[in-house]
């Protein structure tokens, strides 16, 4: 399905090169790519959507300078949607520490010693460096018709994570580096991971406002009564959403295109 590749062949454009909407960014963009690959979607997507992603899906998500230069080449006159990171809370706070921590304002079930409350401002300061590259990327897309930043899906509940984390190399490697088995580590609570995700969404929205771009959040319909990602949208791994979630995003992008068309 790839039509164009970057100079090294590492990155590719999937879909029509003349598509009005260009989706790019990190690993959560894969759900849109998977959705646009469905036969029923290929026949019915209007306006057309193209996704710039890895040529080899198993080699990991995009992110280097060549990738963003390729996006710039493709962006002229397009509505560019950047799926920015979205896994910082999973990568940094999947496991509890000793002593246990929480965020101020988060309700935690406590057994024994109370967790140490961390101010929200401190968490925001911790995450901010993961957004700084946007200050370099956004100005290079000056020829785009519009730019929108989109965050990743809300977290999955503990019940799902416990079933699949034993097979996820990123997290088993963390455990190995600590000299323990991943099954011995305590996963942070749903309420804490959800609030960490909320901080990320707030930060991305703030950067969008500062950089003069649009912001598109997770569709509310994708979340359960507790705010977590609904089970019908789970990919098999710990952190990502599936093509059904991608279909929801495609619909949001169609609405977005109508709002920002020039």
PLM regions: where:
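Serine-esterase "nucleophile elbow" of acetyl-processing enzymes
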Residues: 1-57, 61, 69-73
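Conserved catalytic-core segments centered on acid/base and nucleophilic motifs
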Residues: 23-24, 138, 245
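Conserved alpha-helical elements of sugar-nucleotide-dependent glycosyltransferases
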Residues: 28, 32, 133, 200, ...
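Short linear interaction motifs
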Residues: 59-68, 127-131
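Short, surface-exposed amphipathic charged segments that create phosphate/polyanion-binding patches used
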Residues: 62-65, 230-236
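Alpha-helical cap/lid subdomain in secreted, periplasmic
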Residues: 74-231
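Histidine-centered active-site loop/cap adjacent to the catalytic His
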Residues: 232-262
